[in-house]
C-alpha cells in the first residue's frame, strides 16, 4: 500500500517528519509522499537521515492557487526540489506569508462584521507557524458563540466545510477573495513542469463543486494536468473513486492518491487508510514514477 498525501508541522499538520515516518513504517507502507502546503522544507528534515522508514519516498508538495474564481490545490510530484523551491519562495516566503496572514485576518473580520457575527479579537490566537491558517483561528473564535453557530448552521460543524462552502465560494456571503493571495493555476502547473515534475489536481470532490467533472474539463482547457488524485477521503463514498479513475483513464491522465493526513486537525483520518476504506495500491504509480 502507498500514501502520497500527508502533512507535517512544516504546514498545517501536527506531527513532525520523524513521527510521520514512524507511523508510515508501522503501517508497512511501500511508497509515501509528504506533501506539505507551499514549501519543501520537510525534505530537508534530519529525520530522513535516521533510516526510520524502509519504504520509498516520492518528493511532493501541495500548492494553493486560484482558477475561475475558485481556490484549488495542485499536488506536485517528482520535481527538482531546488528549482521548484525557488519559485515557491516568490509567493510563499516567510515574509510574504506573514503579510498575507495579516491581510487575511483583516478581510475575514470585515466579513464577520458584515454578516453580524460576534467575536472577541483579543481571543484570536495567531498560529505559531506562519504556514498555518489564520482563518482556522478566527473560525474557532466565532463558533464559540451560540448565536454564530445558529447563523452558520451546518457550516459550524468543522472548519474544512466552512472553508470550502463559504470562504472560497463566490456565491456565499462569507466569500473571501483568495485569488489576490495565491498564484494562478496555470502559473503553478507551468512551474511544476519547469522543475521537471508532474501536476495533479488534488482531491476534486473536496471542493464540493456542483459539477466536479465539468470543472476539471474547464481547467484542463486552460492548462493540461498530468493527473488527478483519485484516491482521497473525500472520494471514499458514493463510488467517487471509480468515477475519478474512469475520468482519468478516459482522458489519459495519471492517477495518484493519499489520505491527506494532518493528525489532530483531521482526527477521523488515518495514514494509509483515510476514513477507513481507503486502500491505495502501488500499481497506480507505475505509469508515472520511476525510482
Language-model-derived ranges and their functions:
Residues 1-144, 227-251, 256-268:
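A metal-dependent hydrolase metal-coordination microenvironment
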Residues 18-25, 186, 190, 213-221, ...:
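Amphipathic, non-transmembrane alpha-helical secondary structure
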Residues 26, 48-52, 194, 221, ...:
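Secondary-structure boundary motif
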Residues 66-96, 139, 143-173, 273-290:
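Active-site gating loops and adjacent loop-to-helix segments of metal-dependent hydrolytic enzymes
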Residues 124-130, 162-179:
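Surface-exposed cleft-lining segments at the edges of enzyme active sites
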Residues 171-218:
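Conserved, well-ordered alpha-helix/loop/beta-strand core segments that scaffold catalytic motifs
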Residues 198-207, 225-235:
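Active-site core of metal-dependent hydrolases
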Residues 216-231, 269-291:
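Structural recognition of alpha->loop->beta junctions
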Amino acid at each position: 500500500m502507498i500514501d502520497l498525501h500527508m502533512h507535517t508541522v512544516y504546514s498545517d499538520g501536527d506531527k513532525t517528519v520523524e513521527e510521520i515516518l514512524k507511523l508510515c513504517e508501522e503501517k508497512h507502507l511501500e511508497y509515501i509522499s509528504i506533501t506539505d502546503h507551499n514549501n519543501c522544507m520537510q525534505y530537508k528534515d534530519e529525520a530522513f537521515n535516521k533510516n526510520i522508514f524502509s519504504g520509498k519516498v516520492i518528493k511532493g508538495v501541495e500548492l494553493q492557487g486560484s482558477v475561475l474564481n475558485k481556490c484549488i490545490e495542485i499536488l506536485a510530484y517528482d520535481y527538482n526540489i531546488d528549482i521548484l523551491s525557488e519559485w515557491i519562495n516568490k509567493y510563499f516566503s516567510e515574509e510574504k506569508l506573514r503579510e498575507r496572514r495579516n491581510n487575511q485576518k483583516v478581510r475575514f473580520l470585515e466579513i464577520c462584521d458584515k454578516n453580524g457575527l460576534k467575536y472577541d479579537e483579543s481571543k484570536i490566537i495567531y498560529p505559531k507557524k506562519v504556514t498555518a491558517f489564520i482563518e482556522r483561528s478566527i473560525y474557532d473564535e466565532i463558533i464559540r458563540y451560540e448565536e454564530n453557530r445558529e447563523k452558520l448552521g451546518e457550516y459550524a460543524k468543522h472548519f474544512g466545510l466552512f472553508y470550502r462552502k463559504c470562504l472560497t465560494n463566490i456565491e456565499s456571503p462569507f466569500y473571501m477573495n483568495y485569488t489576490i493571495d495565491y498564484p494562478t493555476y496555470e502559473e503553478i502547473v507551468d512551474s511544476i513542469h519547469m522543475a521537471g515534475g508532474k501536476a495533479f489536481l488534488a482531491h476534486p470532490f473536496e471542493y464540493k463543486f456542483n459539477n466536479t467533472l465539468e470543472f476539471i474539463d474547464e481547467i484542463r482547457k486552460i492548462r493540461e494536468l498530468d493527473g488527478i488524485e483519485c484516491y482521497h477521503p473525500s472520494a471514499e463514498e458514493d463510488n467517487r473513486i471509480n468515477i475519478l479513475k474512469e475520468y482519468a483513464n478516459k482522458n489519459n491522465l495519471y492517477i495518484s492518491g493519499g489520505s491527506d493526513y494532518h493528525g489532530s486537525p483531521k482526527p477521523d483520518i488515518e495514514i494509509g487508510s483515510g476514513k477507513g476504506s481507503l486502500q491505495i495500491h502501488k500499481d497506480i504509480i507505475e505509469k508515472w514514477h520511476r525510482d
